[in-house]
UniProtKB/Swiss-Prot annotation:
Residues 766-855 are annotated as: C-terminal. Residues 387-521 form a coiled coil. This is Chaperone protein ClpB. Belongs to the ClpA/ClpB family. GO terms for biological process: cellular response to heat; protein refolding. Pfam families: AAA (PF00004), AAA_2 (PF07724), AAA_lid_9 (PF17871), Clp_N (PF02861), ClpB_D2-small (PF10431). Residues 557-765 are annotated as: NBD2. Residues 1-142 form the Clp R domain.
């Protein structure tokens, strides 16, 4: 007996004992057979459309009528009726050619046994031996019972695979647009005599699984060669196959059963294995074979037609290593679609997403999703990244439609506060409380009326959107029903749906959409819900993903960009020429007219120490990101040795730290829109510049792990002191200084490096007038720090001139000024504050008095 038969017998004995029956009757056994999880009898009844709950209820009634024996303790034994069924089951097993007596043999024996009690029950539920035999043949196929666990080998594909053709017939698969060449190639390989196993190879997100789904859709539409019409495409679920295989050999058993079912279908079933590389090594334990080895013989003989899908990296890593497995598959390369093709693919999918989110998606949104994702999301592939953008933008609007609008929410919160206040004031007895109560009542009445109006408008708009969503879903269902009726040859039904219900529903939808558009036009000012996804919604999602501002510029931002130099001048004094060059680069990028294949700007800032080179970079970061720390700052003095280059892009394979990635590449991967500062660039080893050539020219760099990092949205600034002696020489004219600096640069850097820089910016040495401006900037910072302590401070002109004169040093620039402010102003001031002479609320007046400052 099989395991399930033994379990059923034991359960039947326990049931008889519970019911105090004198012996185990066939009804007890039948009851357990019908209730058996993963058993075969429930599957037979399913196929015969027998309502199991009703069947069990009738059985229970029969069992309850059996005579009962009290006193207990007696041993349970099989009744003569059951023994007769045992013998019949043995005969049944021999007839089927099985080595074990299985549960279905008992069931067939009961049907054929001529037991009057059971016959009545079967007749009432229209269960006949012939029908049961047909159902059983369907379930078992050509399998024989050769071990004690046959149930795991019946209908294994239903357990461990998804029927893609069935899903396609029900309209549950997304339409597949384009990709005709690849599908034709797959069909070509499938039609070979041997080794008819295509494997789809491509980058993640280019649509490999979609090609398999496209083939399923074509099989259903009969848009395939004759040898594929009516075939089933099943997607194997490796996870389900491995999960729960507790004993050694159980996984192999399951896989053998899958292979057997596919091969015995005589080519009717094509297997699709997504993530094909999971086959190699799957289920491998010591002494066991892995899945790949079990599949090889069937694949080579052409008995098992299989479509695989995997990425380039995994194919190389797992499948190419096993040459015997590799030669059984024929590769079909799936390239990333072009921008135009991706737009076509999105247009094909648009309807599915509109139905799901209940929102219209404009064509402009589809185009901008593809173009923006192609330009700004460089580490992923089309069409997947563009589909994700559209999906998220539509999801955002869909959520807004379904949740209470902000205006309504705000009013309801106000109402809540007023009601709480009203309850508190009711307890007060004085006049002012009564007056306030009257005011609150009036406010509550007004807000209630306003809320009522807004809620009605929201419900009305929401109702319109929901109505359109429901109609679209209905139309989708009707189209599936039409296709099904046409396939089944029910032309009457197809005509009724196609020329009756479908046009009617489409007409309704058109009318609803027209009304909705009219309403949107007439009340565009007061409209609460937005019901279509536009390009600006997509741009907003891109900005959230990448941090790159691609959304439409607001008035305030365009004004800010036009006057960018003025904001930078508040921090950087005396270097107007340098600020204009940087501002122009940022404006070009934001207007989207700069070269999309290069960084926003690459500059080299030259000049003596302390003239504001690094300060300009910080000011730029604060202007762009409101945070001066948003600079990817790399001190090139740390890269003096040749081997330090690997710290920038990450260690090569085989070295410690390979997994970590490089300092420069990782920070730009995380923040693609940033200011990169390479400080003191002349201190680095010359080999470092070889790496920078790629960044300066193509805006890209490949890190130690072979990933391409995109620098197209960065501003790259290098600072250097090369030629600062010439800049400081008072006897040289501007042109002579520039000549001397260029000469020094040519000596220090290679021509191919200098030639790739957008602009070499010379910072002038600072004069006394500029130092005076810097004093004001620094004193503003001091005042800011004191304001936090509630202390005011002001300076007269003499004090400013005194600090400027004392802090001026043409060689060291503005840095000595900070030290002077520290010693002359901050040190004595700190003593005054600590001693308690200066307290919160005071204002300090600072004046110059000869050689010191007085407070």
């Amino acid at each position: 007996m099989t395991r399930k038969s033994q379990e059923a017998m034991q359960a039947a004995a326990r049931l008889a004992e519970r019911k105090s029956s004198p012996s185990v009757e066939p009804e007890h056994l039948l009851m357990e057979l019908v209730q058996q999880t993963e058993g075969i009898v429930p599957r037979i009844l399913d196929k015969l459309n027998v309502p199991q709950a009703q069947f069990l209820a009738e059985l229970r009634t029969k069992i309850d009528k059996f005579p009962q024996v009290t006193g207990g303790g007696q041993k349970m034994f099989a009744s003569p009726r059951l023994e007769k069924i045992f013998q019949a089951a043995e005969t049944e097993a021999q007839e089927w050619g099985d080595s074990y007596i299985s549960t279905e043999h008992f069931f067939m024996a009961m049907l054929k046994g001529g037991d009057s009690e059971l016959n009545g029950l079967f007749k009432k539920n229209k269960v006949t031996a012939e029908a049961a035999r047909t159902a059983l043949t369907e379930i078992r196929g050509k399998q024989k019972v050769t071990d004690d666990d046959p149930e795991n080998k019946y209908e294994v594909l239903n357990k461990y695979a998804r029927d893609l053709t069935a899903l396609a017939a029900e309209g549950k698969l997304d339409p597949v647009v384009g990709r005709d060449e690849e599908i034709r190639r797959v069909v070509q390989v499938l039609s070979r005599r041997t080794k008819n196993n295509p494997v789809l190879i491509g980058e993640p997100g280019v649509g490999k699984t979609a090609i398999a789904e496209g083939l399923a859709l074509r099989i259903i539409k009969q848009d395939v060669p004759d040898n594929l019409i009516g075939k089933k495409l099943m997607s194997l679920d490796m996870g389900a196959l491995i999960a729960g295989a507790k004993y050694r050999g159980e996984f192999e058993d399951r896989l053998k059963a899958v292979i057997k079912e596919v091969t015995s279908s005589d080519g009717q079933i094509i297997l699709f294995i997504d993530e094909l590389h999971t086959l190699v090594g799957a289920g491998k334990t010591e002494g066991a074979m892995d899945a790949g080895q079990l599949l090889k013989p069937a694949l080579a003989r052409g008995e098992l037609r299989c479509i695989g899908a995997t990425t380039l990296d995994e194919y190389r890593k797992y499948i190419e290593k096993d040459a015997a497995l590799e030669r059984r598959f024929q590769t079909v390369m799936v390239e990333e679609p072009s921008v135009e093709d991706a737009i076509t693919i999105l247009r094909g999918l648009k309807e599915k997403y509109e139905v799901h989110h209940g929102i219209r998606i404009t064509d402009a949104a589809l185009v901008s999703a593809v173009k923006l994702s192609h330009r700004y999301i460089t580490n992923r592939f089309l069409p997947d990244k563009a589909i994700d953008l559209i999906d998220e933008a539509a999801s955002k609007l869909g959520i807004e439609t379904r949740s209470v609008p902000e205006e309504v929410d705000k009013i309801e919160r106000e109402l809540m506060q007023l009601r709480i206040e009203k309850e508190a004031l009711k307890k007060e007895k004085d006049e002012s409380a009564r007056e306030r109560l009257a005011v609150i009542d009036k406010e509550i009445t007004e807000l209630n009326a306003k809320n009522q109006l807004l809620r009605e408008q929201w419900e009305f708009e929401k109702g319109g959107i929901e109505g359109i969503k429901k109609l679209k879903a209905d139309i989708e269902d009707l189209k599936v029903a039409v296709a099904k009726a046409e396939r089944e040859g029910d032309l009457g039904k197809a005509a009724e749906l196609k020329y009756g219900k479908l046009p009617e529903a489409e007409k309704k939808l058109k009318a609803l959409e027209e009304r909705s558009k009219e309403g949107a036009k007439s009340s565009s000012e007061n409209r609460m819900l937005k019901e279509e996804v536009g390009p600006e919604d997509v741009a907003e999602v891109v900005a959230k993903w990448t941090g790159i501002p691609v959304s439409k510029m607001l008035e305030s931002e365009s004004q800010k960009l036009l006057h960018m130099e003025d904001s930078l001048k508040h921090r950087v004094v005396g270097q107007d020429h340098a600020l204009t060059i940087v501002a122009d680069a940022i404006r070009r990028a934001r207007a989207e007219i700069s070269d999309p294949n290069r960084p926003i700007g690459t500059f080299m800032f030259l000049g003596p120490t302390g003239v504001g080179k690094t300060e300009t970079v910080k000011a730029l970061a604060e202007f762009l990101f409101d945070d001066e720390q948003a600079v990817v700052r790399i001190d090139m003095s740390e890269y003096m040795e040749k081997h330090a280059v690997s710290r920038l892009i990450g260690a090569p394979p085989g070295y410690v730290g390979y997994e970590e990635g490089g300092q420069l590449t990782e920070s730009v991967r995380r923040r693609p829109y940033s200011v990169v500062l390479l400080d003191e660039v002349e201190k680095a080893h010359p080999d470092v510049f070889n790496i920078l050539l790629q960044v300066l020219d193509d805006g890209r760099l490949t890190d130690g792990q072979g990933r391409t990092v995109d620098f197209k949205n960065t501003v790259l600034i290098m600072t250097s002191n090369v030629g600062s002696q010439s800049i400081l020489d008072p006897g040289m004219s501007e042109n002579q200084k520039r000549e001397a600096v260029n000469e020094a640069l040519r000596e220090r850097f290679r021509p191919e490096f200098l030639n790739r820089i957008d602009e070499i910016v010379m910072f002038k040495s600072l004069g006394e007038a500029q130092i005076s401006g810097i004093v004001k900037v620094q004193l503003d910072l001091v005042a800011q720090r004191l304001r936090a302590k509630k202390i005011g401070i002001d300076f007269n002109q003499e004090a400013i001139d005194f600090l400027a004169k004392k802090g001026y040093d043409p060689i060291y620039g503005a840095r000595p000024l900070k030290r002077v402010i520290q010693t002359e102003l901050l040190n004595p001031l700190s003593k005054e504050i600590i001693s308690g002479k200066v307290k919160a609320g005071d204002t300090i007046h600072v004046k110059a008095n000869g050689s010191t400052l007085t407070f």
